[in-house]
Amino acid sequence: MQKQAELYRGKAKTVYSTENPDLLVLEFRNDTSAGDGARIEQFDRKGMVNNKFNYFIMSKLAEAGIPTQMERLLSDTECLVKKLDMVPVECVVRNRAAGSLVKRLGIEEGIELNPPLFDLFLKNDAMHDPMVNESYCETFGWVSKENLARMKELTYKANDVLKKRFDDAGLILVDFKLEFGLYKGEVVLGDEFSPDGSRLWDKETLEKMDKDRFRQSLGGLIEAYEAVARRLGVQLD
């Protein structure tokens, strides 16, 4: 499957058309951004690591019965995916307090959240991805009530699957975001799951092993990503 025209260039990925109108090529670049794209740097191997990491996670979620857009790996930095009609709202699950939740509520970082919190954010970099709720989604027609309920159900199911897998690898799945779209009327998991869109801490030391290393200028970004991948059993080379 050959990539053709560039359809969309995001902060860290590029989407291309193919000869099949139902399939796209998703390319992971070495770019890393913070502050809604205000700060961007390149890291060797990052595109490869995130591509293979994403393929591994999507495969495990598919095995658990969660429909995903993933078709197959094409190269170290590219995969073939179904073309989805993307919902402009991100789903976030929080197992522990971190990031914007800590700032918003003034609570201590790291406290366990039981049951996990479920948040919705409008995908809009210019507006810094504002937090919304189910009422907004219905009023503004971003997604139907039925499809949003399905997105929430699949997000919690993904959390159950991944929380255990990361725990078995000596990692805490602090929080993560998922994006969904429609494929022939069905809600399907799209975009990616990688350390770019999740928070992952070492279970013993609480060391941050995700993009917070870049956001907070901690250093060792790729080393942390590769360490997480190895613990999970992702084949990188």
UniProtKB/Swiss-Prot annotation:
Cysteines engaged in disulfide bonds, as pairs: none
Pathway(s) of this molecule: Purine metabolism; IMP biosynthesis via de novo pathway; 5-amino-1-(5-phospho-D-ribosyl)imidazole-4-carboxamide from 5-amino-1-(5-phospho-D-ribosyl)imidazole-4-carboxylate: step 1/2
Keywords recorded for this protein, A-Z: ATP-binding, Ligase, Nucleotide-binding, Purine biosynthesis
Entry EC no(s): 6.3.2.6
Residue ranges of the TM segments: none
Family that this chain belongs to: Belongs to the SAICAR synthetase family.
Protein name: Phosphoribosylaminoimidazole-succinocarboxamide synthase
